[in-house]
């Protein structure tokens, strides 16, 4: 949002800020009705008057003298009692007489009240003969312009009461969230409506402009409907209520980090839910933005993405031939290895807020969860996968890729590749049978969903490393992927530990290696940050590959827990 002014908030003042807000907000409001509503609300005279009063009081509060103490009345009483016990000189008698005067006592009492800021009136005790069934009354003030109120009313045939019959979504009443179906209408702008017909009340409403004041008796809520089932959600973004200008009370807000599990306690408010952090001993719920509200905000805040396709003409295999990956290193060709236009559009439309989750523990006999490794080129995915395979060949396995090129003499079907015709490969692409695919020298290469199913059907853990934008195709109840993001250490550690290491590059099956360059390190860091920023909400485990042995031990321990312990997964994965 553009800056409101080059002046600071204290120099501008709340009143001046209020006057420029409509013009500043206009570029960000698409609906003409919403623009009209904002102009009417900010142009309301009573609102401007309240702001002026607020500024006057604020100015006085800033320069007002600070009271020395807030017990002047009791101090004067103690002094009077002390003086009366002393010898009765003329000065003492005069002072005692002065302090005993009612107006002096009242003055000191007012002083103490102001010093303590005890402005709220003391309510009398409730009478003993109070009617428990007496209705409570709510005063509601709505600001509307020429648009309809967005609510219909009816007259109860038995009691004659005027009731709210329907709330139209998107109308002024709906946006306010203050008027509900079943509320009894008692007054409109101070005019009693008990003896009026609905048509007369509608006429009063249609003739009213600006602010409309309602006196209503809230309807009785259905207790069965107000009881909400227990719901757990995974936070897909970081949230700090202290930085949220929209939250009604910052002190009541609940902060959380991406990946935290929250228990939603109430969704009564469409904008602010009440939730608790799972596992937190604090029993008090806090306010968090609702899913719909946060999605709307992120959609407004999110900049329009600039699509950058990865260009390459070379293809690389991840150490073992069965692990299919596409290279991005050769920039001489304009041919895109990935058909990523469709997936890019999906990613920009996907606004990460919350995901409803539940606990899942793999039962004996169930298929293993698919293990997906994600990371930038050169970070060491291939080495980690190779070490896992060597550690237990009966437990871990990888997929066999498909290709449209001809089989060579030393190759066997289903060992190095699944060899299929180009026409069949293109048909499988159209039928979305590939997780990812690419083309090199006129031949297609790809990893199919069936190849993953083949590994899982053998009761083995399938190890797969893919580009992060393909994760959306794998996040299904069938695969229940456990996504591990492997990131590089800081660039200083990369220079220390990988300066003499080799990065694999290859053309077709002929692999070669070369030393890491400074450009490789910078590209690795940059790609890692991009992946984490854009897809971090999909990662269940993040491992920093500073030391390969340590990283491998951490990965193997995490995979052991996946098989033996309960984990939070999307609730949709357990409903299929």
From Swiss-Prot:
Task: State how changing residue 556 to N affects the protein, per the record.
Answer: In hmp; leads to vertebral ankylosis
For the PDZ domain, which residue ranges apply?
139-220
Key words, A-Z: Cell junction, Membrane, Repeat, SH3 domain, Tight junction
The name this protein carries in UniProt is MAGUK p55 subfamily member 7
Bilayer topology term = Peripheral membrane protein
* Annotated GO biological process: protein localization to adherens junction
Q: Where is the Guanylate kinase-like domain?
A: 368-560
Q: Which GO terms describe its cellular component?
A: adherens junction; bicellular tight junction; cell-cell junction; plasma membrane
Free-text function comment from the UniProt entry: Acts as an important adapter that promotes epithelial cell polarity and tight junction formation. Involved in the assembly of protein complexes at sites of cell-cell contact.
Residue ranges occupied by any L27 domain in the UniProt entry: 10-64, 65-122
Top-level taxon of origin: Eukaryota
- Record-linked PROSITE patterns: GUANYLATE_KINASE_1 (PS00856), GUANYLATE_KINASE_2 (PS50052), L27 (PS51022), PDZ (PS50106), SH3 (PS50002)
Tell me what gene encodes this: mpp7
The family line of this record is:
Belongs to the MAGUK family.
Q: Which residues form the SH3 domain?
A: 228-298
Which species is this UniProt entry from? Danio rerio (Zebrafish)
